[in-house]
């Protein structure tokens, strides 16, 4: 089995489904690069991710991003056959902090404007999580903020940081 495959299976992954806002994706990419977490971009983006666009944006960390592109969710699922997909949504009821994260989890986030498709949430409701907010008039957290909260909790729970300090 190729080493890259083993690494993808044995670690947390992050997937963004059809991200629309370049700075959000850039912030998530930096977060993933800093933690050596693979980033999966699923579907079309509202912006270009080619070398020229990345250089123009000054993303000096981009070579460190473990980036994978997928045309759709089925392709993502096929690329990570051993992963447990966990979906983050403002529509979910279960708190992310009540979830027991595993090394094989792939944290899936939807578009900034609409979130994940309704049919995806319905089909995976038992693995849908939300990040609570105290103010009911605030629609949602910024995508990059939400990814940071969930990813660091997953890394904490799976002992990644503890292993680094030993």
Positions of the model-derived regions?
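Post-transcriptional modification and biogenesis factors for structured RNAs
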Residues: 2-166
């Amino acid at each position: 089995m190729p080493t890259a495959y083993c690494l993808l299976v044995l670690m947390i992954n992050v997937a963004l489904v059809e991200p629309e806002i370049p700075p959000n994706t850039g912030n998530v990419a930096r977060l993933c690069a800093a933690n050596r977490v693979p980033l999966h971009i699923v579907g079309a983006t509202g912006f270009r991710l080619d070398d020229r666009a990345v250089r123009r944006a000054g993303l000096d960390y981009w070579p460190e991003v473990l980036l994978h592109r997928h045309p759709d969710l089925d392709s993502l699922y096929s690329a990570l056959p051993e992963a447990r997909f966990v979906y983050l949504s403002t529509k979910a009821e279960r708190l992310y902090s009540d979830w027991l994260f595993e090394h094989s989890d792939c944290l899936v986030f939807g578009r900034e404007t609409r979130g994940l498709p309704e049919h995806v949430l319905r089909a995976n409701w038992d693995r849908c999580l939300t990040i609570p907010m105290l103010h009911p008039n605030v629609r949602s957290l910024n995508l990059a903020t939400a990814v940071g909260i969930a990813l660091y909790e997953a890394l904490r729970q799976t002992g990644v940081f503890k292993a680094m300090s030993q």
